[in-house]
Amino acid sequence: MAHKKAGGSTRNGRDSESKRLGVKRFGGQVVIPGNILVRQRGTQFHPGVGVQIGKDHTLFAVVEGQVKFEVKGKLKRRTVSVVAA
């Protein structure tokens, strides 16, 4: 009789789904209120003028205008603003 020994088991084979984080609207792009600008974990980017932050640290536009990325302050914080186009 033909025999085949049992194959060993593996402890691999799992991976989490990617979360699609990152900058969604780049500098100079025109946005309307509600547009998501940045999806992030923690505050890599801080909200500036015309931008608010969601409970998952998502930055979104609250006014219509052009996206502007800046480095501000003594702590060199990266901020995202929406200025009138």
Swiss-Prot record:
Residues 1-22 are annotated as: Disordered. It comes from the Bacteria. GO terms for biological process: translation. Gene3D superfamilies: 2.40.50.100. Belongs to the bacterial ribosomal protein bL27 family. PANTHER family: LARGE RIBOSOMAL SUBUNIT PROTEIN BL27M, RIBOSOMAL PROTEIN L27. This is Large ribosomal subunit protein bL27. It comes from Marinomonas sp. (strain MWYL1). The lineage of its organism: Bacteria, Pseudomonadati, Pseudomonadota, Gammaproteobacteria, Oceanospirillales.
